[in-house]
């Protein structure tokens, strides 16, 4: 039957409920138990055994069989599933002569139903509610996909996530774990004295990252504004103001490409601690990820995309110079000649832009030849100053900064610094970024005079980090695409939407 015909038939059934003086969309239902709780409470009930405990359950009908004078419905709620067993004689005695007929003729898979009865385990071992009375709670008008026959089209799963959640229990579990991960990160930080403070989403300067922002316009102020690309600069202002341990977990927006690792709207947690450096922050990140994995998975060992990853062992720490030398044979440490560095890179198959500096070439070698191979947790340390305008100059290595990125399973998971607090150096770097922006670099950092004014009042030695929540969820749920861990990912509208 075509979908429109099914829709028409179900609308007619809804009207039939009204004819029988039954509202197919009542206002509430008094539920006493969840399906999962009943499954746990009566797990030891033997086959054929019944108890007189009265229960009321409610949920969606996900399976349905009517066999003469008995009916078996599968009911799904937020905690799991349980079978409803209807006996025609019992229903007629409790609800009237036509009640079983209405159940048979006027309900469908996808409807919501409430059922009151007692608990029994069938001879075949299925825990069931032996229904004495039922109530239709919502008549569904469109048919739903089933776990077995329905939703396999990936794009439809993302576009109609509500159907995906109904049809695929594993998807619901992913989002439960995501919520737990977020909760545990906040708990971890709160217990260590960090304070979460919200910073603006609408900004007059979109700074804190190398990214292209989304633009909007404030009508009342007559002002072009941007959606934030990071929370960094406002959180540092808070450190200037006296908050020594501060963080924010929230949405970030970047007007960039979409891939299995990138969504224009995503979630990060940024953390800043005064009187710390990037070594302290690496310790914090390592402890945090280990604690979250233990709570969410019950273990610090996990499997992601076929790779066994150990978060319990000390995370590897290696400089970018050393990593590139180990993986490519190209040793750039101490080299100042960009042309020579370019020849060395091209010898291993990396095409370099004319005029690139040694630092830019080093980073390109890392991205193209090393990044994807970092399966076990690895802190890559000490980045070129050219690509890190907000990180503090390295205390001993010229032209490098005290920056790290954490890679797990070939993905960047965290990015942290010893934060640049020298206002003269910071001004010079932002001026260089402004020149690059004027020359056409859309991802160059904007010149933010207010931020410079803030740190001229004094930013204490500070360590900071941003952790990608979506990628962390991908890791801990073994999800291959970022769209699998964002409830409603960004998609191009279909024709007619």
UniProtKB/Swiss-Prot annotation:
GO terms for biological process: lysyl-tRNA aminoacylation. GO terms for cellular component: cytoplasm. InterPro entries: Aa-tRNA-synt_II, aa-tRNA-synth_II, aa-tRNA-synth_II/BPL/LPL, Lys-tRNA-ligase_II, Lys-tRNA-ligase_II_N, Lys-tRNA-synth_II_C, NA-bd_OB-fold, NA-bd_OB_tRNA. Its cofactor is Mg(2+). Mg(2+) 2 binds at residue 412. GO terms for molecular function: ATP binding; lysine-tRNA ligase activity; magnesium ion binding; tRNA binding. Pfam families: tRNA-synt_2, tRNA_anti-codon. Mg(2+) 1 binds at residues 405, 412. Binds 3 Mg(2+) ions per subunit. Its EC number is 6.1.1.6. Its main location: cytoplasm. It catalyses: tRNA(Lys) + L-lysine + ATP = L-lysyl-tRNA(Lys) + AMP + diphosphate. Keywords: Aminoacyl-tRNA synthetase, ATP-binding, Cytoplasm, Ligase, Magnesium, Metal-binding, Nucleotide-binding, Protein biosynthesis. It is found in: Cytoplasm. Belongs to the class-II aminoacyl-tRNA synthetase family. HAMAP family: Lys_tRNA_synth_class2. Homodimer. This is Lysine--tRNA ligase. It comes from Gloeobacter violaceus (strain ATCC 29082 / PCC 7421). The gene is lysS.
């Amino acid at each position: 039957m075509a979908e429109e015909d099914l829709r028409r038939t179900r609308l007619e059934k809804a009207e039939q409920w009204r004819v029988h003086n039954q509202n197919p969309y009542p206002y509430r239902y008094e539920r006493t138990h969840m399906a999962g709780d009943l499954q746990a409470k009566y797990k030891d009930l033997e086959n054929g055994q019944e108890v007189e405990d009265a229960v009321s359950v409610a949920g969606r009908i996900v399976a349905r069989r009517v066999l003469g004078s008995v009916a078996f419905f599968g009911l799904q709620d937020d905690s799991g599933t349980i079978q409803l067993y209807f006996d025609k004689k019992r229903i007629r005695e409790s609800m009237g002569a036509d009640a079983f007929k209405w159940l048979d003729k006027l309900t469908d898979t996808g409807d919501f139903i409430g059922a009151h009865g007692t608990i029994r385990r069938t001879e075949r071992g299925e825990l069931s509610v032996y229904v004495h009375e039922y109530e239709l709670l919502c008549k569904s008008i469109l048919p739903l996909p089933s776990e077995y026959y329905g939703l396999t089209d990936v794009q439809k799963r993302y576009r109609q996530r509500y159907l995906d959640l109904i049809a695929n229990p594993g998807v619901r579990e992913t989002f439960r774990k995501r919520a737990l991960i977020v909760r545990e990160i906040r708990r971890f930080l709160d217990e260590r004295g960090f304070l979460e403070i919200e910073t603006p989403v609408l900004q007059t300067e979109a700074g804190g990252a190398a990214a292209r922002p989304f633009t909007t316009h404030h009508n009342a102020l007559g002002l072009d504004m941007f959606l934030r690309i990071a929370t960094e600069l406002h959180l540092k202002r808070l450190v200037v103001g006296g908050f020594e341990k501060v963080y924010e977990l929230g949405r970030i927006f970047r007007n960039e490409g979409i891939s299995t690792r990138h969504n224009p709207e995503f979630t990060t947690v940024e953390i800043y601690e005064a009187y710390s450096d990037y070594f302290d922050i690496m310790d914090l990140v390592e402890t945090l990820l280990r604690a979250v994995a233990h709570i969410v998975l019950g273990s610090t060992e996990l499997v992601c995309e076929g790779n066994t990853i150990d978060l319990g062992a000390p995370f590897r720490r290696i400089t970018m110079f050393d990593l590139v030398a180990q993986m490519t044979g190209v040793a750039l440490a101490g080299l100042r000649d960009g042309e020579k560095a370019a020849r060395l890179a091209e010898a291993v198959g990396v095409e370099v832009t004319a005029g690139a500096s040694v630092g830019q070439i080093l980073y390109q070698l890392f991205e193209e030849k090393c990044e994807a191979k970092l399966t076990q947790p690895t802190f890559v340390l000490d980045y070129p100053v050219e690509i890190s305008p907000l990180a503090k100059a390295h205390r001993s290595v010229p032209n490098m900064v005290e920056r790290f990125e954490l890679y797990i399973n070939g993905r960047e998971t965290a990015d942290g610094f010893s934060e640049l607090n020298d206002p003269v150096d910071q001004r010079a770097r932002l001026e260089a970024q402004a020149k690059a922006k004027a020359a056409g670099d859309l991802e160059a950092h904007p010149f933010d005079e207010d931020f410079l004014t803030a740190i001229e009042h004094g930013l204490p030695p500070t360590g900071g980090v941003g952790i990608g929540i979506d990628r962390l969820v991908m890791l801990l749920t073994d999800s291959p695409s970022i769209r699998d861990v964002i409830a409603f990912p960004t998609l191009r509208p279909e024709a007619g939407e």
